[in-house]
Structure formats: C-alpha cells, structure tokens
Amino acid sequence: MGYRKLGRTSSQRKALLRDLATDLIVFERIETTEARAKEIRKVVEKLITSGKKGDLHARRQAAAFIRHEVVEVVQVDAKGKDGSTVKKNRPVYALQKLFDDVAPRYAERQGGYTRILKKGPRRGDGAPMVIIELV
C-alpha cells in the first residue's frame, strides 16, 4: 500500500504529518487539503488505537511521534512548604490528552475515529479543502 508524497522530502513530510496529527488531537478539528487529510487519517487512527491499549509501550511509541505541545493549563491543589494548600498551574500535554481524553472516548469503537467533510476549493490555488475532525 502506497502513500502520498505531498510534494516534500521524507523528513519534511514526516514533520508535516506530526504537526497535523498533533493539531488534530489538540483541537479535535482542523481544516487542510484533501490529500493531507487522507494521510493524517491513517496516522491518527493508529495513534488512537495505540492509545486505547494504554500500556507503556504504546505511550512511548505515541510520545516518539506526537509533538510535546501544551493543550491547556489547569489549576491543581498542592501542599505548600508550611502544610497549607496552594493552587499550582499544571500543563496538560497532547500525549496526555490522547491517552486520558481521546482514546477512552472510542473504547467501544473498532476504528473509524475521524470524519472528513469536503469544504470546497481554496481561493488562491483551487486546492480541494476539507475539514477533518474526530467523530
């Protein structure tokens, strides 16, 4: 089974797919070209399937691919030096969101975690644009 070259060298293509896959996990919906969306779909489906396994090996494989990007910052209660409770800001990363939020959502689903909606041609060059989102 082949893949699309997307007019780039292999390192550029890998970086593009990493960025778009991370963005799809973070935002759960992105707008891109049709060819890119079809390639991202393959990558994200495999990441979510490994996220459903949830073991250490799956987490390390996903960490090797997903960018170390902060999704949001949450406040948590922590103990201070004097024993009082203090509010601390703790970042939530894309990998953590994949394993804690996204993958458990699809525990009963056997594949088909993404949806591609056609949007129409891009104004500048007429490239077919789509919206890819997590179902």
From Swiss-Prot:
It holds the Pfam family Ribosomal_L17. One of its GO terms (molecular function) is structural constituent of ribosome. The keyword Ribonucleoprotein applies. The keyword Ribosomal protein applies. GO terms for cellular component: cytosolic large ribosomal subunit. SUPFAM superfamilies: Prokaryotic ribosomal protein L17 (SSF64263). GO terms for biological process: translation. Keywords: Ribonucleoprotein, Ribosomal protein. Gene3D superfamilies: Ribosomal protein L17. Belongs to the bacterial ribosomal protein bL17 family. Part of the 50S ribosomal subunit. Contacts protein L32. NCBIfam families: L17 (TIGR00059). This is Large ribosomal subunit protein bL17. It comes from Listeria monocytogenes serovar 1/2a (strain ATCC BAA-679 / EGD-e). The gene is rplQ.
